[in-house]
Swiss-Prot record:
This is Trimethylamine monooxygenase. The keyword Glycoprotein does not apply. It comes from Roseovarius nubinhibens (strain ATCC BAA-591 / DSM 15170 / ISM). Its cofactor is FAD. The keyword S-adenosyl-L-methionine does not apply. Keywords: FAD, Flavoprotein, Monooxygenase, NADP, Oxidoreductase.
Amino acid sequence: MTKRVAVIGAGPSGLAQLRAFQSAADQGAEIPEIVCFEKQANWGGLWNYTWRTGLDENGEPVHCSMYRYLWSNGPKEGLEFADYSFEEHFGKQIASYPPRAVLFDYIEGRVHKADVRKWIRFNSPVRWVSYDAETAKFTVTAHNHETDSTYSEDFDHVICASGHFSTPNVPFYEGFDTFNGRIVHAHDFRDAREFEGKDVLVMGASYSAEDIGSQCWKYGAKSITSCYRSAPMGYAWPDNWEEKPALEKLTGKTAHFADGSTRDVDAIILCTGYKHFFSFLPDDLRLKTANRLATADLYKGVAYVHNPAMFYLGMQDQWFTFNMFDAQAWWVRDAILGRITLPKDKAAMLADVAERETREEASDDVKYAIRYQADYVKELVAETDYPSFDIDGACDAFFEWKKHKAKDIMAFRDNSYKSVITGTMAPVHHTPWKEALDDSMEAYLQN
């Protein structure tokens, strides 16, 4: 009897899984029946932009955390698919920091070519997953918004690829409830032009704080104040951008910081991170981990140690993205196809997790972290037939990216890198990022 595999989510990780199975089928392998459940009306996950916030057209929590004018905050050379280059997709090499629409088109191009859309049930959020140890089957309950019906089906494996950047972590501070300006989490941030002429407080010191603050600066915010809990971002910011230690409270429109300083602000943007949140999973199947490189309870970073018939994709903190999701998806595919044997001993799988955590914690150096994840990708690629690519070259692109950011945080996107797939150097974009106000694909591809 043919196995059945449920994939939850048709974002970059879920699409990688579909592509992995399609690749095996193309080579003559007998693959399971694949059903991918996607809550949105289209694929792409976070990259599927919507103007909506709060609830979507079906009354479901909006998944998208993307905003207008978003450009990649890392070089595309670090995420390029090994089996589908940017040059193949666009017919030429493109600059190194594409806007969201360009990356979405690239993601979509590969899965169109692979013809995997037939496996996806759109507008179909998963409501619940359960496991029966006697039958060794998962029961997945989903809702079809097109027919307004709820149904259940059984599967041999479940692959959770729902992501972990869609459920915001929203803190409360004294004075929030009486602040007369706008308070918005990064998840619901959509357009930097809303903050033109305003004094903006950006709470957080990670990538979303850096990028959203930069967007607001680019599109005319009067000033940016960013605050941090542990360490400042520390870049050479423009004159109207200041970093402060942790926010303590608000009185009226005045923000009070841990160093005793104050700042009047018109709007607050919470770049305070996201939660691993799986409302459709019972406690015994639900991953519980911090956002880190070595995820808790996942053997090889993907197989759930408490039930290794279940897998998770893309749950790590990420330097590598699309190509790491591919490496994971190919590995999971081969585990399901019986090409890779999982340890039968749970203790052995937990030991693997512990060893990865120990190695991650050995250094807090950024280069070490990048190399750590690169070694993880190499490990998975070596165990499958995923096309090998220059992973060390991708690391070099990341290292150069960090240098360029330190040199000029508002101009790092004007640099170019060499493709680790084709070896072609990216052209310099026709317009400096600070001046490129049109983020459309048509404008971007005019090189």
